[in-house]
Amino acid sequence: MTEINFRNAQFLISAPSLRECPAEEGAEVAFAGRSNAGKSSAINCLTNNGKLARTSKTPGRTQLINFFSLGQGAQQRLVDLPGYGYAKVPLATKREWQAHLSEYLYKRKCLRGLVLLMDIRHPMQEFDTMMLNWAVDANMPVHLLLTKSDKLKRGAANNTLLQVNRSLKESGVQDLVSAQIFSSLKNVGVQQLEQVITGWLNLPAGEDEASVKN
């Protein structure tokens, strides 16, 4: 397995739709979540670059599909998808974002996995479930990142993780979906996230993690 130095990450391009995305070459992992779930902060924490992905206290500022290369040739990429569900924008705009997200998940052939971020205090909201269902329907590996774990005591955070994993097992998707606790503020869970993404980016084209395990 090829090791990845996430600190080499650099901004590549912003795309308003799938047509403007980089060429279907190499492999990429996407980050998705509600507008206040901490996507940009997680990417900045993972890459140890506080200025890589734009962060804002105003939810919904990420309205484009933002790509970051992880090395020369941009053959491995991280993707920051538009936040959903919380942003105070017109309904028509929300629907347009949802259409772009759905199109990206179903049609982007070089996408190897989806990191789905949820505030650990409010996991599995309506839009989270919608995104998870889209990914599962597309047979896309998903890693749930329960963010802002520093807002809870360790026992409460672990209990939430246990409940989420139980829900995944009851839904029968545990082979395709995993979960972990994460805090960009305290650097909790960074190494585990690195391992998951590295594994995905090393998957051969056309294979998912479940098929490799089997």
Curated annotation (Swiss-Prot):
Amino-acid positions noted as binding Mg(2+) in the UniProt annotation, renumbered to this chain: 40, 62
Every EngB-type G domain range: 25-203
InterPro entries in the record: G_ENGB_dom (IPR030393), GTP-bd (IPR006073), GTP-bd_ribosome_bio_YsxC (IPR019987), P-loop_NTPase (IPR027417)
Single Gene Ontology BP annotation: division septum assembly
Gene3D superfamilies: P-loop containing nucleotide triphosphate hydrolases (3.40.50.300)
A Gene Ontology term for the protein's cellular component: cytosol
Membrane spanning residue stretches: none
Residues annotated for GTP binding in this entry: 33-40, 60-64, 80-83, 147-150, 182-184
GO molecular function: GTP binding; metal ion binding
Requisite cofactors: Mg(2+)
Family label: Belongs to the TRAFAC class TrmE-Era-EngA-EngB-Septin-like GTPase superfamily. EngB GTPase family.
Function statement: Necessary for normal cell division and for the maintenance of normal septation.
Protein name per Swiss-Prot or TrEMBL: Probable GTP-binding protein EngB
